[in-house]
């Protein structure tokens, strides 16, 4: 029997104990990842995932999430999902109930969620709405979004929204995506990723969290890896897959993450081009890397009473 392990990115500590409880009972890595991530998505103090996530430039919360299992490389994801608070569960349902597809986005993702009995909810909290309005006022005085009746007001809003996309993409964080990777007692692995994406992003933007090989990759021949940060870079670099390929070649998890991030950092990008990655191997070794000093990840084993923070290797 394999010793179960679960690791997560910054702010996953809210959910990891729920995931480890599943693993202690002999549950699957997939069940553990879903249980842990749902706790994170339901955490109203976290403005970068689930309910309370910061909205797009139009003031609408859009969520991305994915799950992938290591033994068969099954993958399910949703992108730009509106109105459903637990996208990780909808992503799992895509994988299990809609095997002819891997990824649903926008209206199609919401239709699938409704058809499969997921309960809808208002995702924009008062606090997140206030943060959005503050940014609009900072960018253009007295603009109230598309409720503004004047043509000139609408024009100013759209211009401000585009400026917000450009200004907020390189914001100072914390980087919002949550990564969780689990190894169960049967040797199966699962990677889960969930996010509300860049604050005030262009409507419809889908990042690396919903794309296999970019923000999420799991293959028992190497392990599991996930990314957070500048998603457009990991989309271009296939960063999560690169990490796992390096694990399969024998690199230690922290080194594999570092090498993959160094490769992605070499891509030209005018925004803040920092990525973070973490990885777990089928024999339970784990590590992470980041382009910012002081970055950590969280880990729990069967012997843990609470998540332990570990430093990431600096790129």
For every predicted segment, state its role.
Residues 1-315:
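Alpha/propeptide regions of enzymes that mature by internal proteolysis
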């Amino acid at each position: 029997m394999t010793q179960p392990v679960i690791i997560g990115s910054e702010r996953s500590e809210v959910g990891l104990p729920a995931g480890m409880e599943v693993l202690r009972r002999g549950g699957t890595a997939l069940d553990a990842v879903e249980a842990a991530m749902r706790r994170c998505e339901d955490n109203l103090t976290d403005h970068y995932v689930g309910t309370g996530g910061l909205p797009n430039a139009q003031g609408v919360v859009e969520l991305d999430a994915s799950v992938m299992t290591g033994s068969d490389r099954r993958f399910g994801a949703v992108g730009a999902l509106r109105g459903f608070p637990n996208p990780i569960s909808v992503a799992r349902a895509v994988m299990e109930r809609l095997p002819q597809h891997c990824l649903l986005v926008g209206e199609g993702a919401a239709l699938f969620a409704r058809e499969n009995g997921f309960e809808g909810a208002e995702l924009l909290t008062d606090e997140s709405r206030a943060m959005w309005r503050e940014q609009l006022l900072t960018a253009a005085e007295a603009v109230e979004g598309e409720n503004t009746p004047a043509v000139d007001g609408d024009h100013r809003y759209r211009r401000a929204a585009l400026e917000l996309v450009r200004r907020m993409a390189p914001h100072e964080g914390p980087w919002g995506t949550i990564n969780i990777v689990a190894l169960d007692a049967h040797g199966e692995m699962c990677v889960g990723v969930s996010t509300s994406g860049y604050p005030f992003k262009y409507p419809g933007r889908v990042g690396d969290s919903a794309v296999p090989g970019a923000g999420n990759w799991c293959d028992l021949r190497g392990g599991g890896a996930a990314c957070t940060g500048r998603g457009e870079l990991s989309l271009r670099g296939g960063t999560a897959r690169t990490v796992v390929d390096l694990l399969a070649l024998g690199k230690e998890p922290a080194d594999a993450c570092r090498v993959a991030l160094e490769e992605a950092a070499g891509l030209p990008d005018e925004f803040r081009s920092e990525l973070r990655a973490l990885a777990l191997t089928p024999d339970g070794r784990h590590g992470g890397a980041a382009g910012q000093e002081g970055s950590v990840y969280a880990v729990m084993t069967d012997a843990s009473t609470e998540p332990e923070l570990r430093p990431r290797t600096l790129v």
